[in-house]
From Swiss-Prot:
Belongs to the SEDS family. FtsW subfamily. This is Probable peptidoglycan glycosyltransferase FtsW. Pathway: Cell wall biogenesis; peptidoglycan biosynthesis. The chain crosses the membrane at residues 15-35, 48-68, 80-100, 144-164, 168-188, 192-212, 278-298, 311-331, 342-362. It catalyses: [GlcNAc-(1->4)-Mur2Ac(oyl-L-Ala-gamma-D-Glu-L-Lys-D-Ala-D-Ala)](n)-di-trans,octa-cis-undecaprenyl diphosphate + beta-D-GlcNAc-(1->4)-Mur2Ac(oyl-L-Ala-gamma-D-Glu-L-Lys-D-Ala-D-Ala)-di-trans,octa-cis-undecaprenyl diphosphate = [GlcNAc-(1->4)-Mur2Ac(oyl-L-Ala-gamma-D-Glu-L-Lys-D-Ala-D-Ala)](n+1)-di-trans,octa-cis-undecaprenyl diphosphate + di-trans,octa-cis-undecaprenyl diphosphate + H(+). It is found in: Cell inner membrane.
Length: 373
């Protein structure tokens, strides 16, 4: 397979999606350096520590995206089942001593030389590919409970139980939402989804309120000022960052909250640093870029030539939309903390590489739209 791309070949792809993905990734590398340099200097005696790693992740991600762009998306339909089974196997590997890695009480990573891989990130794409394959196969049968709803709920329950065992409620909720939205778009009867939601609410309440750190997050979300030095500390510092930034920002690299005030400044709360340094204008531009990317993804889904491509593109666009919206809502205090990275921008190799891989698939679908030669 020739991976070289000439100008005419590039023009076949949705250039808006391509440009948004590249621009957000490059911006993310810059912001990771800005948000992490002080901490990296103190912890590793190298202010460029996270910048160098994120730069490598970005290059790897661009390479993976370039490969995915050239692979006919219909190829993934043939391997949907083994890919999903492989990802489920990887999810189990994190529990094996010596292979799995833990941090802050959560077992979510597989230790690789120089790199910790988070299989839940790849499982998100595997689940979307499988659901697109299955929904395409079932067609009108998706309207029936026994064939078009129950099997997906069983599969989803298995995946979510594994993720909850890893203490990864954020990934579990994300996958659940993406799956439900895909089912709704495919024609599943709304009453099934509503009934499932009503049954899930008490379970979700138990999962949150029965676990101390999750319960404290909810209480901090409702009233962070009740405990401003502990559970409410992170969101208060995030608000201070946005407040310091105002409309125009303090200037790139000039933020103060990243100086050990704001926890997770270069990961989950990197948008807060962006708000402090680039202001409301900078955050608005980033939000607009995400919105444009998601809308173009939905456009690709609507114009796809056949159902598998339609469901696959819609699932990827939905995933990008949910993850970016939830992260932005968390850092502004609209939602309780979830531990979800901001796609393309937050520090992290697994998230960035898998996200660019998904964009590559979306770009390939964009070359095979209705009316295209």
């Amino acid at each position: 397979m020739n991976l070289g791309l000439n100008v005419k070949e590039i023009e076949r792809y949705d250039l808006v999606i391509l440009l948004m993905a590249v621009a957000l990734t490059c911006f993310g590398v810059v912001m990771v350096y800005s948000a992490s340099s002080v901490m990296a200097t103190k912890k590793f005696h190298d202010g460029f520590y996270f910048l160098k790693r994120q730069g490598v992740y970005a290059l790897l991600g661009f390479g993976v995206m370039a490969v995915a762009m050239r692979i006919d998306y219909r190829t993934w339909r043939e391997y949907a089942v083994p890919i999903l089974l492989g990802c489920l196997f990887l999810l189990f590997l994190v529990f094996i001593p010596g292979i799995g890695g833990a941090a802050k009480g959560a077992s979510r990573w597989i230790r690789l030389p120089g790199f910790n891989f988070q299989p839940s990130e790849l499982t998100k794409i595997a689940l979307i590919v499988y659901m697109a394959y299955s929904l395409d196969k079932k067609q009108d049968k998706v309207k029936f409970f026994s064939t078009g709803f129950l099997p997906y709920m069983v599969l989803l329950s298995v995946v979510l139980l594994i993720l909850l065992k890893q203490h990864d409620l954020g990934a579990a909720l994300t996958m659940g939402l993406v799956a439900i939205i895909m089912l709704f778009a495919a024609g599943t009867r709304p009453r099934y989804i509503i009934a499932m939601g009503m049954m899930a609410l008490p379970i979700l309440y138990f999962l949150v309120m029965n676990v101390d750190y999750r319960r404290r997050r909810i209480l901090a979300y409702l009233n962070p000022w009740e405990d401003p030095t502990d559970t409410g500390f992170q969101i208060i510092q995030s608000w201070l960052a946005f407040g310091n930034g105002g409309v125009l920002g303090q200037g790139l690299g000039e933020g103060k909250q990243k100086m050990f005030y704001l926890p997770e400044a270069h990961t989950d709360f990197i948008l807060s640093v962006t708000g402090e340094e680039l202001g409301l204008i900078g955050v608005t531009v980033i939000a607009a870029m995400f919105l444009m990317l998601v809308l173009r993804g939905v456009r690709v889904a609507l114009m796809a030539q056949e159902p598998f491509g339609r469901f696959l593109a819609f699932g990827i666009a939905t995933l990008l939309g949910i993850q970016s919206f939830v992260n932005m809502a968390v850092v502004t205090g609209l939602l309780p903390t979830k531990g979800l990275a901001l796609p393309f921008i937050s520090y992290g190799g697994s998230s960035l590489i898998v996200t660019l891989f998904a964009v590559g698939i979306l770009l390939n679908i964009s070359t095979r739209l209705k009316g295209a030669p």
